[in-house]
Amino acid sequence: MLIKLLTKVFGSRNDRTLRRMRKAVGIINAMEPEMEKLSDDELKGKTAEFRVRLEKGESVESLIPEAFAVVREASKRVFGMRHFDVQLLGGMVLNDRCIAEMRTGEGKTLTATLPAYLNALSGKGVHVVTVNDYLAQRDAENNRPLFEFLGMSVGINLPGMPAPAKREAYAADITYGTNNEYGFDYLRDNMAFSPEERVQRKLHYALVDEVDSILIDEARTPLIISGPAEDSSEMYKKVNKIIPHLIRQEKEDSDTFQGEGHFSVDEKARQVNLTERGLVLIEELLVKEGIMDEGESLYSPGNIMLMHHVTAALRAHALFTRDVDYIVKDGEVIIVDEHTGRTMQGRRWSDGLHQAVEAKEGVEIQNENQTLASITFQNYFRLYEKLAGMTGTADTEAFEFSSIYKLDTVVVPTNRPMIRKDMPDLVYMTEAEKIQAIIEDIKERTANGQPVLVGTISIEKSEVVSNELTKAGIKHNVLNAKFHANEAAIVAQAGYPAAVTIATNMAGRGTDIVLGGSWQAEVAELENPTPEQIAQIKADWQVRHEAVLASGGLHIIGTERHESRRIDNQLRGRSGRQGDAGSSRFYLSMEDALMRIFASDRVSGMMRKLGMKPGEAIEHPWVTKAIANAQRKVESRNFDIRKQLLEYDDVANDQRRAIYTQRNELLDVSDVSETINSIREDVFKVTIDAYIPPQSLEEMWDIPGLQERLKNDFDLDMPIAEWLDKEPELHEETLRERILAHSIEVYQRKEEVVGAEMMRHFEKGVMLQTLDSLWKEHLAAMDYLRQGIHLRGYAQKDPKQEYKRESFSMFAAMLESLKYEVVSTLSKVQVRMPEEVEAMEQQRREEAERLAQMQQLSHQDDDSAAAAALAAQTGDRKVGRNDPCPCGSGKKYKQCHGRLS
């Protein structure tokens, strides 16, 4: 009550922000007559003038009124479009490191030209980020004439472009591209073998379109670049045969319920758990198939990979459905994006899940992958000096934007008042009743000439509605992942009188639905249209436009509530753009996923008590409220998941930053000999310490062991025992110095053979390659640690703290291994002539290129089988107590990690 009263007196934070910005809008409007008087050349010359002023120390903020006035005037001359006052407000919000919530049809693309131009003046580059390649290309081509008129260069960054073209795109003042491609380029730059291979500049200003989709919907899944691991396709096939023998249990086991099934499914967490009975049965079946030895347990350390295969197969059968989560096309399993309904060609699930789905569908199983580099969108976008975004729906997620990205959300008012009618939800008992009611509604509306857009949450649901419409003889277009190519054309004509369009989720987002259809699309179909033809098409369109407005505008039907209120609002937002008429309604049933999982039995109980007959719907504020509460629950759960992912990824992020900084410094220098000399001293000290403990008696020295180690790991033949026999006065310190001096001498002889320049080149190559190889293994080990760390909670320990502690010690061990491997490799390499080093370099380059071609880019669930694979590889061979410890510390196993066991 008090807060409401204070808001009434002082206005909300949003009102105060807009009030402050409206003063600047007044100044920009006052400059308009002055700008109109300028010739084209004088207007273009403003860009150079602004750049000089910035160099002299003026701030970007001080240029806002003039720069915005220049862009508005240029837009009038190039496009014949004048920025509305609300678009100027939006531009200021975006420059202010905030998120601008602007309704659909309010011209976000044109608004973005203002802050993009302003921030490109510094010459550091602006990245405009869109959700797909089509929008990136469309927006770049649409805005190119405006920016080029003002003397700015425009680049497009698309997947599959060669490195020189990418470098050129990034060197432009303003670059358009997709979120995935920017992230992958960052990872690839940090895997480059020479400074020339890098494509990105320093990350300066990112302007994210559909910011909610990119920074929230896709934030749970990291970007991963992976390379091939070993082939285990046969195992997937064998395990896949076993799964159909298992029976699903309806509910999870608890104190009150002990089921009879073999596995239970937790739909909320998207996890599958074996029951006691299931474990016994699966172990029997594995023994019968000859996959596991009799008397062994699935949970024994030696069967860790087998457990991984069983879990992946169970998840593939119980949680992933064809035509909902993926489609099978040309013998390939293609993932369907749950947020947009689009297919994600070339993307693969990790953790062996994709292989398990391939086995289930009987298509060819492709090799598993090992993570080479990964980053989450949260951490990638936080690398930019300045970040801003725009969307039609951000207010429901304002808290998350603020707490994770430090971005405030500002709701920008619409240019014209919104008059769309949002009707209450109708809830039916069964799916069939709901579909029937939707068909009746469509019939009624199209009879009046009103266009209808039906939003579904999966391909499967869109095909169910499509089949029913076909039976009813209603002509319609289907827009889902299977018909990706016609997307923009179908969306553009969805406003045609009596048109019926079915769209999965938010497919076609970013394309306006114009009431009466798009006359531009009709003109584009004619080869050489005459002015008369164009005038006729426009006149016909005007008639259709008026007819659609009279029938009530575009009607939106939602066939199911989405987990997030925001995505429901996006669907509604396709109608009622720029003050047009429109309406919307959601049809639900008690069989919908959201209702089944979250709206509990209470609502269905209430519906039964009301004595509902088949085909009847309930329409009540209580029900709508119960659904909104269910959605809030899901939203807060998803927020917690993303927050937790971020907290864990922050640990990896600190390490990633340290490694990438080190790697870039290494790339930029040509001589690393000083570093090599310094780490050689460290490595030899640690190695000698393992056999000659500091300040110890001679009886405690293990000289034969040391000689053998130096020979095996560093290819050094040193008669240490002979030295000690001949020189009794040779004490520990002098001996250490002599061993190091001898190793340096041998190395220098190698250098004399090949020449200093060639050796420096070779040292740098070895260092980069070793760093990449160990970092890859470290990522796998971190994934593996992450998967099991939650179990520490049972020991009353905080899993996050444990993860931080252990990952830090793993990182320290990796750095020690790096030193050891580099010195060992450089010591062991045999060179007799310069050509041999050149041949090795060539071989290394070819191997790097081969791996680059085999790399796979994925944006998927945050877990990796690579880790488990690595653990299994190292778990096969038992380490002897006197062997060097595998951690690379240089100590014996019994004096290092062997002590723990």
UniProtKB/Swiss-Prot annotation:
Positions with biased composition (Basic residues): 891-901
Q: Where is this region: Disordered?
A: 852-901
The listed locations are:
Cell inner membrane; Cytoplasm
Cofactor binding: number and manner: May bind 1 zinc ion per subunit.
Catalyzed reaction equations: ATP + H2O + cellular proteinSide 1 = ADP + phosphate + cellular proteinSide 2
- Which positions does UniProt annotate for Zn(2+) binding? 885, 887, 896-897
Q: What is its EC number?
A: 7.4.2.8
What drives induction of this protein's expression? Repressed under conditions of excess protein secretion capacity and derepressed when protein secretion becomes limiting. This is regulated by SecM.
Q: Name one GO molecular function term.
A: ATP binding
Which Gene Ontology terms of cellular component type are present? cell envelope Sec protein transport complex; cytosol; plasma membrane
Sorted UniProt keywords? ATP-binding, Cell inner membrane, Cell membrane, Cytoplasm, Membrane, Metal-binding, Nucleotide-binding, Protein transport, Translocase, Translocation, Transport, Zinc
Its domain of life reads: Bacteria
**Which metal ions or organic cofactors does this protein require, according to UniProt?**
Zn(2+)
Q: Which cysteines in this chain are paired by disulphide bridges?
A: none
Membrane disposition: Peripheral membrane protein
Q: A single Pfam family, by name?
A: P-loop_SecA
Residues that bind ATP: 87, 105-109, 512
Q: What class of enzyme is it?
A: translocase
Q: Which SMART domains match?
A: SecA_DEAD (SM00957), SecA_PP_bind (SM00958)
**Keyword Transcription regulation on this protein?**
no
The family classification in the record reads: Belongs to the SecA family.
**Binding partners and assembly:** Monomer and homodimer. Part of the essential Sec protein translocation apparatus which comprises SecA, SecYEG and auxiliary proteins SecDF-YajC and YidC.
Q: What does this protein do?
A: Part of the Sec protein translocase complex. Interacts with the SecYEG preprotein conducting channel. Has a central role in coupling the hydrolysis of ATP to the transfer of proteins into and across the cell membrane, serving both as a receptor for the preprotein-SecB complex and as an ATP-driven molecular motor driving the stepwise translocation of polypeptide chains across the membrane.
Q: Please identify the protein, giving its name as recorded.
A: Protein translocase subunit SecA
Q: Gene name on record?
A: secA
